[in-house]
A protein has these predicted regions:
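Charge-dense, helix-prone N-terminal extensions
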Residues: 1-126
């Protein structure tokens, strides 16, 4: 699945299954930035999001809803049904990762920056 490859390509991304075989949990420095799971017959991903952007994305895409089993202000669930363009989905993945990295303790964040560079961690949000 392409989304799993995108998620694992993020610097120091780790895949974990703390809740059993579903969901697949993606972390950086022990902090979750994405959860990949099935809801019925559809693959979905939970992604962290700036609250204002979260609302805008929900208005723009029917496949984007408040985060399933998450803080609905800060997380969106995206149904991977093909209705969200790949470029937009990748931007959402990058944004989620960036928000989590920015929320890390200073020493953890600086360590990541030293090992990978700011552009690898923050992309266009650097």
């Amino acid at each position: 699945m392409q989304i799993q490859q995108w998620l694992m390509a993020k610097p120091e991304a780790q895949l974990d299954y703390p809740f059993g075989p579903d969901p697949a949990v993606f972390k950086v420095q022990g902090k979750i930035f994405a959860l990949l799971f099935r809801q019925g017959d559809t693959d979905c991903v939970n992604l962290k999001c700036d609250p204002q952007q979260a609302i805008g994305l929900r208005d723009l895409f029917a496949a984007v809803t408040p985060g399933y089993h998450m803080n609905k202000r800060h997380w969106n669930t995206v149904k991977l049904d093909g209705t969200v363009p790949d470029g937009e989905l990748q931007r959402m993945l990058d944004h989620s990762y960036t928000l989590v990295v920015r929320g890390l303790r200073l020493a953890e964040r600086r360590g990541l920056e030293a090992r990978h560079g700011r552009s690898a961690l923050y992309g266009s949000e650097a």
